[in-house]
Amino acid sequence: MKILHTADWHIGQFKGPVVDGVNLRSQDTVKCLEYMVQVAIEEKPDIVCVSGDIFHQEQVGPVRYSDEMITATNIITSLAHFSKYVIVMRGTPNHDGAAQFRVLERMLLNIRNVDVVTEPGVIKTPWADIACLPGFDKQEFRAKFPGLSADEENLAWTKYISDMVFALRAECEKTPILMAHYTVPGCNMESGQTSFFTNFEPVIPREALMAARYEAVLLGHIH
């Protein structure tokens, strides 16, 4: 089994040089994604796992929205053409908006070997069972755990996520693989993403991952 794991594309506009109306950082992102497609052509993976944050911003103007959606759709369609199965999972809501993913899912609806995942669940493929744990939604969590302090929220949410890791593992029959868009304590943050987002940062404890005994853990979020 061969897996192409990717995440945190952040398709969108960034602060940086603009030449002839083209944002060069955004252009570089697209070039990197096109290079990834070339790798897929050469490697022919069985499964492509995209672990969240396809887009950079949830709320953008109509022109950018169209351009970014076309870019995402084209890249995913190309990956689907050169692999056997593609799983695209939603990341954090401030990047991967609910409306964006509804449109993305609709755009990819007729591509039979693509699954767009917005809720926790297990995707069963001929090669492995992929447990998917998309990014958090603050309001959804607070509805489940009302009236807690910030510290209590983090503890409750982290326990909830850990429980989901075990519950999804129990649904796996073939080779179990976890896709998740959360921080794992102890991860390498040398790229500059050095804060644990102290206001709100539920994590997956390493102990939970070890105990759940997934064959592979394919993360997004910290980069």
Where in this protein do the model-derived segments appear?
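Extreme N-terminal starter segment of soluble prokaryotic enzymes
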Residues: M1-L4
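Conserved protein kinase catalytic core
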Residues: I11-F14, Q59, G97, E140, ...
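Receiver (REC) domain switch-region micro-motif
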Residues: V48, P176-L178, V217
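Conserved catalytic scaffold of divalent metal-dependent phosphoesterases
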Residues: Q100-V203
